[in-house]
C-alpha cells in the first residue's frame, strides 16, 4: 500500500505564478493545491461519480413526485432516490473533498491514495446497486450493494483515521472530521439493519423509529457536522474573510454532536414522557448547533473583503437559508408526531434538497473550477493567454441554475405540504433543469483546454460582469 509523502510542518512558499496579477483567485485559493495533496484523479473520480448520482437523483424526483406529495416516505421508490442524494451526491462529494482538503486544513496528506481508489471502486458501484435495488425491491442488488458500500466506507474510515493520527494541531476541523466519521459508521450500521428489515421484517413496529434515527444521524451527524468543519476553513478562504470571530464553529459542533446522540436515544427509547423529554432536549441542542453554524457563516460573510458574491457563494448562502427553514420547521414536526407524513416529508425535503444539496453545489462551484485551472493552465502562465478561474464557467448560467434549483425546491415543498401532485412534479422538473445546467457548467470546466474553448462558450462580458 503506497503512502503519500508527509506535508512539511512549515507552510510552503507560494509558487512564482501566484504573484502574477492575471488571475486573483488562484492566489486566494492556492492552499487547495499545496504540497501533499493527492493527484487530481482521486478527488476527480469522486466528483464525477457524485455528479452522475445528482443527475439520477434529480430525475428520480420527477418520478417519485406523486409519492412525495402523498407523504409516502416509506415507499421503496422514495428510499432509492433519497440514497442517490445522501450516499451518491453528498457523501461522494465529501469523500473527494476530504482527500483534497486534509493537507490544506490539517497539514497531513492522505495515508494511502491507493486505498482511496479502492474505496471509490467499491463505494460508487455499491451505492448505484443499493439505490437501484431498494427502488426496485431487489434483495440481491441490495445485498451486493450494501456489501460494496461496507468495503468502501471501511477503507475510507481507516485511511482517514490513519491520516488523522499524524495531526499535531488537533483543532475544530480535526474534531469535526472525527465526529462526522463516527456518525458515518453509525449511519451505515443502522442502514444495514433497515436493509435487512426489508426482507425479514424483524424490526416490526420499530421500523419508522429506526428510520427516523438513521436519517437524522446521517444528515445531521455525518453530513452537517462535516460541512460545519470544512466550512470553517473554506468559507474564510473563498470570502477572504480572515479576522472574523471563529468561536461559533466549536459551539456548533459541540451542540450538534450532543444533540444528535441525545435525539437518537430519545427516538429509540419507549418510556413515554421520559422518552419525549429526551427527544426534545436533543432537538433543542441540534437547533442551537444549527443557529451557531448560521451565526458563524454570517460572520464570515460579513467580514469578507470582496463586496460582491460570486455564483458559488450565492448558492451556498441560499442553501443556508433552506437549512434555517428546515430547522425552524423541526419543532413543529416533532410536536405533530408521525401521523403528519406530508409535514415530515416537507421538513426533510427543505433540509436535504434545498439546504445541504444546494450548499454543496456552491462549494463545488468553488473547488472544481480551481482544481481544473491548476491542472490545465498553471504551467502556461506567462507563456500564452489563459483564462481566469472565474472564466471557466458562465456566471449567468450559474445564476439561472440557482434560480431554478431554489424555486424548484421551494415549489416541491409547497406541493408536498398541500398534497398537490402536479405542483410537486412541475417543481421537480425545475430542480432537474437546474441540475442539468449545473452539470453542463462543470462539464465545460472539465473539458476546457484553452482560452479559446472558454471564449467560444462564454457570455457577453458586460452581462457576466454583473454576476461577478
Can you annotate each of these PLM segments?
Residues 1-468:
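Hydrophobic alpha-helical transmembrane segments of multi-pass integral membrane proteins
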Amino acid at each position: 500500500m503506497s503512502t503519500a509523502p508527509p506535508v512539511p510542518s512549515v507552510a510552503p512558499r507560494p509558487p512564482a505564478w501566484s504573484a502574477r496579477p492575471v488571475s486573483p483567485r488562484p492566489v486566494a485559493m492556492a492552499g487547495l493545491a499545496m504540497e501533499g495533496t493527492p493527484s487530481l484523479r482521486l478527488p476527480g473520480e469522486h466528483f464525477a461519480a457524485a455528479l452522475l448520482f445528482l443527475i439520477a437523483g434529480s430525475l428520480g424526483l420527477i418520478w417519485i413526485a406523486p409519492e412525495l406529495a402523498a407523504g409516502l416516505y416509506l415507499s421503496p421508490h422514495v428510499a432509492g432516490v433519497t440514497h442517490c442524494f445522501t450516499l451518491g451526491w453528498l457523501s461522494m462529494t465529501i469523500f473527494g473533498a476530504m482527500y483534497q482538503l486534509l493537507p490544506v486544513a490539517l497539514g497531513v496528506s492522505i495515508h494511502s491514495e491507493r486505498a482511496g481508489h479502492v474505496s471509490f471502486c467499491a463505494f460508487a458501484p455499491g451505492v448505484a446497486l443499493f439505490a437501484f435495488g431498494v427502488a426496485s425491491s431487489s434483495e440481491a442488488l441490495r445485498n451486493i450493494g450494501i456489501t460494496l458500500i461496507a468495503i468502501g466506507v471501511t477503507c475510507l474510515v481507516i485511511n482517514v483515521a490513519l491520516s488523522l493520527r499524524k495531526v499535531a494541531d488537533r483543532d475544530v476541523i480535526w474534531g469535526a472530521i472525527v465526529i462526522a466519521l463516527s456518525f458515518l459508521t453509525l449511519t451505515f450500521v443502522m442502514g444495514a439493519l433497515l436493509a435487512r428489515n426489508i426482507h425479514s421484517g424483524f424490526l416490526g413496529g420499530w421500523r419508522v423509529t429506526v428510520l427516523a434515527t438513521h436519517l437524522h444521524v446521517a444528515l445531521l451527524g455525518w453530513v452537517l457536522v462535516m460541512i460545519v468543519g470544512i466550512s470553517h476553513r473554506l468559507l474564510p478562504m473563498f470570502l477572504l474573510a480572515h479576522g472574523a470571530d471563529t468561536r461559533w464553529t466549536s459551539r456548533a459542533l459541540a451542540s450538534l454532536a450532543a444533540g444528535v446522540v441525545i435525539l437518537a436515544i430519545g427516538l429509540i427509547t419507549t418510556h413515554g414522557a421520559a422518552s419525549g423529554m429526551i427527544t426534545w432536549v436533543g432537538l433543542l441542542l441540534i437547533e442551537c448547533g444549527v443557529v451557531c453554524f448560521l451565526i458563524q457563516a454570517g460572520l464570515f460573510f460579513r467580514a469578507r473583503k470582496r463586496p460582491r458574491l460570486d455564483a458559488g457563494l450565492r448558492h451556498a448562502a441560499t442553501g443556508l437559508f433552506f437549512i434555517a427553514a428546515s430547522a425552524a420547521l423541526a419543532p413543529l414536526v416533532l410536536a405533530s408526531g408521525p401521523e403528519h407524513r406530508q409535514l415530515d416529508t416537507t421538513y426533510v425535503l427543505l433540509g436535504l434538497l434545498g439546504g445541504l444539496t444546494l450548499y454543496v453545489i456552491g462549494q463545488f462551484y468553488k473547488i472544481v473550477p480551481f482544481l481544473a485551472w491548476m491542472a490545465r493552465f498553471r504551467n502556461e502562465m506567462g507563456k500564452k493567454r489563459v483564462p481566469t478561474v472565474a472564466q471557466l464557467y458562465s456566471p449567468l448560467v450559474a445564476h439561472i441554475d440557482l434560480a431554478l434549483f431554489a424555486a424548484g425546491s421551494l415549489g416541491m415543498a409547497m406541493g408536498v405540504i398541500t398534497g398537490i401532485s402536479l405542483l410537486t412534479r412541475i417543481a421537480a422538473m425545475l430542480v432537474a433543469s437546474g441540475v442539468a445546467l449545473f452539470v453542463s457548467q462543470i462539464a465545460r470546466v472539465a473539458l476546457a483546454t484553452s482560452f479559446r474553448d472558454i471564449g467560444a462558450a462564454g457570455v457577453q462580458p458586460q452581462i457576466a460582469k454583473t454576476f461577478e
